[in-house]
Curated annotation (Swiss-Prot):
Principal location: virion
UniProt KW keywords: Early protein, Virion
Record's subcellular location: Virion
Assigned GO CC terms: virion component
Organism this protein belongs to: African swine fever virus (strain Badajoz 1971 Vero-adapted) (Ba71V)
Record-given protein name: Uncharacterized protein I73R
Top-rank taxon: Viruses
Induction record: Expressed in the early phase of the viral replicative cycle.
Family, per entry: Belongs to the asfivirus I73R family.
Length: 73
């Protein structure tokens, strides 16, 4: 998958879900919504190379419930 497309998918996930997302959450969202399999570390390399995106992710190691269980208001 090309890098620009993956970056746009990450941006879209960060905009769509208002609660804090970790890199692992983002990977799960993209894999579920776009029905793709991402290589290990692909999301991390995108986030670490793009400071704008890196600022937006949650880095506290807090465990959140899986995104598909959460209910939206």
């Amino acid at each position: 998958m090309e890098t620009q497309k993956l970056i746009s998918m990450v941006k879209e996930a960060l905009e769509k879900y208002q609660y804090p997302l970790t890199a692992k959450n983002i990977k799960v969202v993209i894999q579920k919504e776009y029905n793709v399999v991402l290589p290990t570390g692909s999301i991390n390399s995108i986030l670490y190379s793009n400071s704008e995106l890196f600022e937006k992710i949650d880095k506290t190691n807090t465990i959140y419930p899986p995104l598909w269980i959460r209910k939206t208001n």
